[in-house]
Each structure stands twice: as structure tokens, then as C-alpha cells.
Amino acid sequence: PGELCQSDFTDMKALGVTILGKPFDHLVYHFVLTYSNWETGTICFSESFESLSGGFQNGVWELGGVPEKHRTDRLTAAVQKPDNPEEFTQRYRALLKHYGLQGQKTQPASPNENGDVEQRNYRLKKALEQSLMLRGSCDFISRQDYAVFLKKLFVQLNAGRRDRFKEEVDLLRRLPVKRFDSCKRLQVRVGPSSTIRANHNVYS
């Protein structure tokens, strides 16, 4: 109890969620405590470090404490390429250090090592699909409206895990004084048409 948490990104496109009638293609960063299966999630749009960091931190701050270890699959936002001498990326190492965590990654072609969260991904989508059917619509008035709906679902899913969750919470370590700053700061030049280029994208 209180030792290991796992996380993963899961694609929610197949559920057909819409915002004011427009398709809302998104991912959920899914965070799970492996002993109790307590879970939570954060809406995001890419498997970037910012999404990983934001989702992880939302998870532990909602928990109110920090487990000993965090395991992911071989996300490029966290894990270096095989030919790199460092196991994890610099920014992910900084995140682990900030929370005093031991990082773990799955071995190549062994997603079963992240099995708890992989199984919860499947069950989350099934539960969300059923909740949307009971609601009678997959359309929401805003992203926040959908986020509240998703949050209520996590509360329902966690309701039957209270006893084992209590065992975990009692063993979690204290949170740091503040969150880790996961923003990426860029120095850019303004182009001739009042545009800027950042991360290979042009913005006006």
C-alpha cells in the first residue's frame, strides 16, 4: 500500500464526446494507485511532458500525498531512446526529484508491466460509455461541463475502494510546498506578419 502509482494516456475519441455539437477529440491522462485501484484523470490533447506533468501533479495533489514509485510505459515525454545513457528525460527527472519519487518504466514490448492502469483504461472507457448512455447525450455545453461529468464518474468508481484506499493514504509521503513548474518557456521572434513560430507551429 502507498508504494506504487502508474499512469498512462488513453485516447477517448471513440466515445464520440462533443462540445456544442463539435467533436471533442481528446486524451485522458489516467493516474492509478495499484494497491487500491483508486484513480483519477485529467483531460489533455497530446502525450507531451506538460500533459504528463500536469496530469501526474493533479493526481497526487488530489490524493494529498506522494507514493514511493511512479511507473509509466515508454512515453517519449519521460523515457529516453535506448541509445541514450540516461534512463529518463531531463525534465521528467526534475519532476521525479521534486516529489522524491523513484521512476520506473516498462520494458520494451511488455505493456503488461503497466497492467493496472492499462486495465483501468479499458474499464474507465466502459464506465464512461455507460454513463453517457444513461445521460442520454454525448454533447456538453463546455469543456468544463464535461470535466465535471468525468470527475463525478471517478468519484463513483472510487466509492467501492475506500478501505484499501485508506490503507494507502496513511502511508503516502508529504507533498512538497508547491507544484513543479512544468511550463516550457521559449524565446521567439515576431515575424514580418506579426506571427511567431514555436515548436514548429506558427501563431498570429
Task: Kindly label every feature range from the protein language model.
Residues N121-S204:
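Active-site-proximal acidic segments at structured loop/helix or strand boundaries
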Residues P1-G16, Q90, K166-R179:
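Basic, flexible linker segments flanking DNA-binding modules
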